[in-house]
From Swiss-Prot:
It comes from Gallus gallus (Chicken). Its main location: cytoplasm. Probable core component of the endosomal sorting required for transport complex III (ESCRT-III) which is involved in multivesicular bodies (MVBs) formation and sorting of endosomal cargo proteins into MVBs. MVBs contain intraluminal vesicles (ILVs) that are generated by invagination and scission from the limiting membrane of the endosome and mostly are delivered to lysosomes enabling degradation of membrane proteins, such as stimulated growth factor receptors, lysosomal enzymes and lipids. Keywords: Coiled coil, Cytoplasm, Endosome, Membrane, Protein transport, Transport. Disulfide bonds: none annotated. Belongs to the SNF7 family. Probable core component of the endosomal sorting required for transport complex III (ESCRT-III). ESCRT-III components are thought to multimerize to form a flat lattice on the perimeter membrane of the endosome. The lineage of its organism: Eukaryota, Metazoa, Chordata, Craniata, Vertebrata. InterPro entries: Snf7_fam. This is Charged multivesicular body protein 2b. Residues 25-55 form a coiled coil. A motif (MIT-interacting motif) lies at residues 202-212.
Amino acid sequence: MASLFKKKTVDDIIKEQNRELRGTQRTITRDRAALEKQERQLELEIKKMAKTGNKEACKVLAKQLVQLRKQKNRTYAVSSKVTSMSTQTKVMNSQMKMAGAMSTTAKTMQAVNKKMDPQKTLQTMQNFQKENMKMEMTEEMINDTLDDIFDASDEEEESQDIVNQVLDEIGIEISGKMAKAPSAARGLPSASTSKASTISDEEIERQLKALGVD
């Protein structure tokens, strides 16, 4: 019972109109089929009367055939009109739904615009850009520090390689033998000691000659 008093929506009205138009189209199609059947019967009657030579009957039947064909042609016109109305109804329904969708979208956009503060949005974007720049600077500093560490390590390794090469050239190994180098040469006179001894002997001989001692 509640459905009887329920207010019809636009969609309900359009659906009813479409049902009525489809029903009208079916009726027109049936009527045209009946007229075509009568048309064939009249054509047979006219041929029959013509064979018997009944001219008056042929004239009467011919007039009926003309009227029937006019009526059949009118069914085509009516059918075309019904089809056009059905198409217009579908177009109107589509336009109505599109308008409804646009209205809903407009309301949604309006609600979003009310909640969205342009100043806050701009500030958020600026803060994001600022923090992003900080992150990039921090990352760059970390990369520079790591590069310095690795470069220093490389320089230390290069320096050690040079020291090892020099020690190897003079016959001293770095693996603990540098401490033994002085003791190994302890029994040998140094260059400075030998030179000092030579100078001392010459000085003694000079002094002896000065004294007349051979």
